[in-house]
Regions:
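Membrane-interface aromatic/basic loop that binds lipid-linked glycans or pyrophosphate carriers
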Residues: 1, 36, 270-316
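Cell-envelope/extracellular polymer assembly enzymes that use nucleotide-activated donors
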Residues: 5-8, 38, 190
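Short, well-formed alpha-helical segments that are part of the catalytic scaffolds
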Residues: 16-30
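A conserved acidic beta->alpha catalytic loop
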Residues: 26, 43-53, 71-73
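Short beta-strand/loop segment that forms part of the nucleotide-sugar
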Residues: 35-45, 65-69, 97
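Glycine-rich, basic loop-to-helix element that forms the pyrophosphate-binding segment
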Residues: 69-87
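Short aromatic/hydrophobic "clamp" motif used to bind/position activated sugar donors
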Residues: 92
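Donor-binding/catalytic cores of nucleotide-activated saccharide
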Residues: 97-229, 246-248
Length: 316
């Protein structure tokens, strides 16, 4: 394998023979020099011929590695973490096995990275043919590429899935950011909210060109109604502790970031019986700052006020 690896593409795989074939075919036609790209397919003990299909591309893709698991973990976190352990590229790019990228994607992304010197390059999403997965443009609203953005000044809080984002590996390594292996929903949120907290600047490619196409809806759709409040509060508290412990962030930056994330998580947390109180007990000293923060929305203000009024007390 070449020592000059620019990008590590990480693909978790489980029983997606057709999807992995299409994805790897599209990687074969990249305009970018694929000698500078490693592709890590991390299989979670597929029971179909997905792994065999992937091995057929070994001669076409010079730096293809296939990791095989002895047991099925039941999610994407374990396969992704195994791939992170061996990744060598300057950049990480996560792609789901049902999805694919267009031939100019890597070239455009690295060109933007070199120009901007940003820590993250985000690719706008497009729906693949026959996909019924919802498509939101709110996080990718510019037709042209925008660089040198601060997270607080974007709408990337509406894009908390890790796919389609080039992330500097040194940032993930420095801050020991991993995917959680003890929850089954919103693992991406756990990982990406921590990344968003510590990247200094971000580029978002314009949607005038096609980049990342996704196919199937996630096994558990990421909606407020089917994310268990106990998991939602677990994720938020983990991110809260991570952000609070970052010495390179100012206190104002920490509160800005925590407020933005709480806006997204309020409805999920307040829907539980015990989750609101667990959240309140853990974050109470900071809530008076959050409630006055410039980024807070009305729904979150009401939630915090009701917490202080005791309206979520399980004994009421």
């Amino acid at each position: 394998m070449s020592k000059n690896i620019e990008i590590s593409i990480i693909i978790p795989l489980y029983n997606r023979a057709n999807g992995i074939q299409r994805l790897l075919q599209n990687l074969c036609i990249q305009s970018f020099d694929m000698n500078r790209v490693e592709i890590i397919v991390s299989d979670d003990k597929s029971t179909d011929n997905s792994v065999y299909i992937a091995t057929l591309f070994a001669k076409k893709l010079p730096n293809l590695t296939i990791l095989k698991s002895e047991v099925n973990s039941g999610g994407a976190s374990v396969p992704r973490n195994k791939a992170l352990d061996i990744a060598k590229g300057k950049w990480l790019l996560f792609i789901d096995s049902d999805d694919y990228i267009t031939g100019h994607t890597l070239t455009d992304a690295i060109a933007t990275a070199n120009k901007s010197q940003d820590d993250m390059i985000c690719l706008p999403y497009f729906r693949a043919k026959d996909s019924n997965r919802p498509l939101s443009r709110s996080a990718f609203s510019s037709s042209t590429t925008v660089i040198n953005l601060k997270f607080e000044n974007t709408k990337l809080y509406n894009s908390l899935n890790v796919i389609g984002k080039l992330i500097k590996r040194e940032i993930v390594k420095k801050h020991l950011i991993r995917f959680p292996e003890n929850i089954r929903v919103r693992e991406d949120n756990w990982f990406l909210m921590q990344v968003y907290s510590v990247v200094k600047s971000i580029s978002i490619l314009g949607y005038e060109k096609d980049y990342y196409f996704y196919e199937q809806q996630d096994e558990v759709a990421l909606t407020n109604t089917n994310t268990p409040p106990r998991d939602a509060v677990k994720i938020y508290i983990a991110v809260f502790d991570f952000v609070k412990s970052r010495t390179e962030l100012s206190n104002d930056q920490k509160i800005n970031i925590l407020t933005i994330f709480l806006n997204r998580y309020t409805n999920m947390i307040k829907g539980g019986k015990h989750a609101p109180i667990r959240f309140f007990n853990h974050t109470k000293p900071n809530l008076l700052k959050i409630i006055r923060n410039q980024y807070i929305d009305e729904n979150t203000i009401e939630f915090i006020e009701n917490l202080f009024l005791g309206k979520y007390d399980v004994f009421n």
